[in-house]
């Protein structure tokens, strides 16, 4: 629940301040604070205390438990992963194109992160304790099977999100951000960046789960070192694609970089554990890709069919709502007919 609550509070903060006539980023900032307190602290604290967590009177520095924790956490503290620095790259390279592109990239990236938070981060957070317990019990085969199943679910959901965001990129950005000085031209630019960002959603989803798999096996250094290397290699990719495609190139560089990072993690995982973690992934992607593409096409057609019924914010919300419902209905129907969900659940 933590990433879902965190992202929802950010969105809610922005909407509340906008309704009060303040189009600045202050509402999003308050949403970050509220989401961090409610999602990342209070929910976790309540759950931990229900499970019997109690604060000891004192923890000596020589405690083996404390030493083990520090050794496990050290790689995460020292590493500069692409996942952490991707936002900074967008801001740094975006400023080279001017103030407008920086905001456009930021809004497009925020929109892309919503389905990642709802699907991938939530799945990763939920799966990690279970995967860790299986490793501690020596059930490595069962752990790998569970991870593979979770990956299949995330891939299916990510493909649907990608198709829907690409099809509804313009009305989505318009509904969320087009007000004040952020006009139609900014919406078009941000929507074009969102298309390239959205292509990377499946890779973000797989990365979130694969990283948890390494963490569950206490191989903390692997995703950190690979992520740090990916960060270094990402810099020339950003430079080249920015020169070629401007704002869209920066978004595409993000997708290319996270794709390379994810593929590298997958190759290392296969080398260490065998190919079972990827069991059925190809079949699942094959059965999910066609329904997702058709669903995206349906969303685009419906959104364009209703675009003249209302203008401005109301019209954009209408397009997103009707297009989203059309995408969901078409995908569920076509996926059921093609046996997509059966391929996901089969081990």
Model features per residue range: what roles?
Residues 1-16, 199, 206-239, 248-251:
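Alpha-helical transmembrane segments of multi-pass membrane transporters/permeases
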Residues 2-15, 22-49, 229-233, 247-268:
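Hydrophobic alpha-helical transmembrane segments
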Residues 25, 44-83, 271-286:
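Interhelical loop/hinge segments that connect adjacent transmembrane helices in multipass membrane
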Residues 25, 30, 67-72, 94-114, ...:
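Interfacial/gating helices of multi-pass transporter permease domains
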Residues 70, 106, 127, 139-168, ...:
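Interfacial transmembrane-helix starts/ends
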Residues 121-139, 148, 211:
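Helix-loop junctions and terminal segments of transmembrane helices
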Residues 166-200, 313-314:
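Interfacial segments at transmembrane-helix termini and the short loops linking adjacent helices
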Residues 301-347:
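Membrane-proximal transmembrane or re-entrant/amphipathic helices at the cytosolic face
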């Amino acid at each position: 629940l933590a990433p879902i609550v965190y992202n929802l509070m950010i969105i809610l903060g922005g909407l509340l301040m906008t309704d009060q006539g303040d189009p600045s980023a202050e509402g999003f900032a308050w949403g970050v604070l509220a989401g961090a307190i409610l999602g990342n602290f209070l929910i976790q604290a309540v759950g931990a205390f229900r499970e019997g967590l109690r604060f000891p009177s004192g923890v000596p520095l020589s405690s083996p438990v404390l030493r083990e924790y520090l050794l496990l956490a050290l790689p995460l503290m020292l590493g500069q992963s692409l996942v952490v620095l991707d936002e900074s790259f967008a801001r740094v390279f975006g400023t080279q194109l001017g103030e407008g592109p920086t905001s456009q990239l930021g809004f497009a990236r925020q929109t892309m992160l919503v389905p990642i938070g709802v699907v991938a981060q939530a799945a990763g957070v939920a799966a990690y304790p279970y995967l860790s317990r299986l490793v501690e019990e020596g059930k490595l085969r069962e752990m790998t099977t569970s991870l593979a199943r979770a990956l299949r679910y995330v891939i299916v959901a990510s493909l649907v999100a990608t198709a829907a965001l690409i099809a509804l990129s313009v009305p989505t950005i318009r509904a969320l951000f087009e007000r004040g000085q952020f006009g139609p031209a900014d919406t078009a630019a941000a929507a074009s960046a969102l298309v390239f960002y959205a292509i990377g959603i499946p890779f973000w989803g797989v990365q979130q789960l694969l990283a948890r798999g390494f963490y569950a096996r206490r191989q903390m250094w692997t995703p950190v070192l690979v992520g740090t290397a990916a960060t270094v290699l990402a810099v020339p990719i950003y430079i080249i694609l920015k020169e070629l495609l401007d704002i869209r190139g920066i978004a595409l560089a993000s997708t290319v970089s996270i794709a390379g990072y994810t593929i590298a993690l997958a190759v290392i995982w296969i080398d260490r554990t065998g190919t079972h973690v990827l069991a059925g992934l190809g079949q699942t992607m094959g059965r999910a890709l066609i329904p997702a593409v058709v669903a995206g096409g349906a969303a685009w057609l419906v959104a364009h069919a209703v675009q003249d019924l209302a203008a401005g914010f109301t019209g954009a919300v209408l397009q997103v709502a009707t297009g989203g419902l059309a995408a969901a209905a078409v995908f569920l129907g076509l996926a059921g007919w093609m046996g997509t969900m059966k391929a996901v659940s089969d081990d």
